[in-house]
A protein has these predicted regions:
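Nucleotide/pyrophosphate-binding catalytic subdomain
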Residues: 1-262, 267, 427-429, 448, ...
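Short phosphate-binding/catalytic loops that engage adenosine nucleotides
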Residues: 20, 146, 275, 341, ...
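Conserved H-loop
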Residues: 27, 282, 348
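Short hydrophobic alpha-helical runs that function as membrane-insertion/retention elements
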Residues: 218-222, 277-279, 345
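A conserved active-site cap/scaffold subdomain adjacent to cofactor or substrate pockets
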Residues: 247-321
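A conserved regulatory-domain signal marking ACT and ACT-like small-molecule sensing domains
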Residues: 288-456
Length: 456
């Protein structure tokens, strides 16, 4: 959204005959949600953090207000009425500040649930960013002479309690009957709280629900990059290629290690409704992007994507009693459920269970509970590297992958693959993360189809 001029020419107005009859679910401008909440990667505090910790949240919010004004000024050349845009967002910010002040007073009383009120404050702050960008987008298109509609799902000024689906249905009623282009806020207010379950993935959830509500022929996500065979920053831009076609199972595998084509809980409604998802590079408009469907299987056996993460650790649980005991795994799962934690992969033998977990989920209290239950509990920082595809069931492919890493001097700590054969996961030392991806991509993606694989 921060490169709106290019998005406008490459996407919204690219085909003059197909401007209308489209709904764009928009996110906030780059960096805005980080300022309102906290930085997604570095966790640098934002307005919400200041509010939750009793800090100077009013000053932090005023700083964001100035950032909104800067963004508005940068869009003047696109036709945005900067004065009207400043007034719109300033009124929102002032309104939010008033709500936060009232909430702070309630929290100080000690008579209310801190968790519930902080959750509401987080949602309130998040909503501003999408309302700002959607409003601006509609106004710019109107200035260019198009019939454009701003659809605000934030529930601003609406005291009626509605579920997310109810609010979407109400807001979109009759939209398909009008000759216009609509810009919809990525945040949607609902009684269930969209951020309580999806947190920063909420805009894609709204996108998915909107697509299902209007029975879209196709849902298209416009990103700053292609869904490619690997991260070009690691492999090199001249070596990776767009995936072009895959299925929702592969998309789920990618999301499991943090390479999200779409939030997994947002993908599911599209998959169940039979709506194809297309991931396009907004800055490469001539390319069709990658089409994700429910039943696609590549006609040739090949690895479609090499990816992974170095932000995981092995939780190793060793106990000599496991070999003769039923239920060790069950007891571990009970602890994970209590701490709202899921694992990425698991390996077992007679007396050891290894779980690969996100580093952020390895809470000291959870580890302490497990230490009281088993002889030895270790946390080992590692990385996971995956070779993923809709059709990788080919004799010798696992040998080819492990051979490539052996040639690169990489020791494989663990291997995981299910009978569906869509994802080979390799656990390696964290320092081998980049080297392992390069080795796998060179061997499995740069050498052509797996039909060339031969067992020697």
């Amino acid at each position: 959204m921060s490169r709106f001029s290019e998005v406008c020419s490459n996407v919204i107005l690219r085909n003059p005959k197909h401007v209308y009859g489209r709904l764009y679910v928009v996110s906030a401008y780059a960096g805005v949600t980080d300022l309102l909440l906290e930085h997604k990667k570095s966790q640098m505090p934002g307005v919400y953090t200041a509010f939750a910790t009793g800090g100077a949240y009013a000053e932090a919010l005023d700083a964001v207000r100035l950032r909104f004004f800067e963004l508005n000024a940068s869009l003047k050349a696109e036709g945005l009425d900067v004065g009207a845009a400043d007034l719109f967002i300033s009124e929102r910010v002032s309104g939010v500040l008033g709500y936060l002040n009232s909430t702070a007073d309630l929290l100080a009383s000690g008579y209310v649930s801190r968790t519930e009120l902080l959750s509401a404050a987080r949602e309130l702050l998040a909503s501003i960013g999408e309302s700002h960008s959607a409003y601006n987008s509609a106004k710019i298109l109107q200035a260019k002479g198009y019939s454009a509609n701003f659809i605000d799902l934030s529930g601003w000024g609406d005291p009626v309690a509605r579920t997310i689906d109810e609010r979407i249905a109400l807001a979109l009623a009759g939209v398909g009957d009008r000759q216009e282009v609509s810009f919809v806020t990525g945040y949607c207010k609902g009684t269930e709280g969209i951020m309580r379950e999806f947190d920063r993935g909420y805009s894609e959830v709204t996108f998915s629900k909107v697509a299902v509500a209007v029975k879209a022929r196709e849902a298209v996500i416009h990103k700053e990059f292609h869904l490619s065979s690997a991260d070009p920053k690691i492999i090199g831009p001249g070596k990776v290629v767009p995936v072009c076609n895959t299925n929702f199972d592969v998309a789920d595998q990618l999301a499991d290690v943090g390479m999200e084509a779409i939030h997994p809980k947002a993908a599911k409604p599209l998959e169940m409704a039979g709506i194809p998802l297309r991931v396009k590079n907004a800055f490469d408009p001539d390319h069709d992007g990658t089409l994700i469907t429910k039943d696609y299987t590549c006609t040739e056996s090949k690895i479609e994507v090499v990816t992974g993460t170095d932000k995981v650790s092995i939780l190793e649980l060793f106990d000599t009693r496991m070999v003769a005991e039923v239920g060790s795994d069950y007891r571990i799962m009970q602890v994970l459920v209590e701490h709202d934690t899921s694992y990425i992969s698991k390996a077992t033998n007679a007396n050891t269970i290894d779980l690969v977990l996100w580093d952020r989920d390895l809470r000291p209290e959870m580890v302490a509970t497990l230490e009281s239950m088993f002889d030895v509990v270790k946390v080992i920082p590692v990385a996971i590297v995956c070779a993923i595809g809709s059709n990788i069931a080919k004799p010798g492919i696992l040998a080819q992958a492990t051979g490539a890493m052996a040639q690169a001097g990489i020791n494989i700590i663990g291997v995981s693959q299910t009978a569906r054969q869509t994802n080979m996961q390799f656990t390696v030392r964290r320092e081998d993360f980049v080297k392992a991806q390069r080795a796998l991509h060179a061997e499995l993606c740069e050498k052509g189809p797996l039909d060339a694989v031969r067992i020697r």
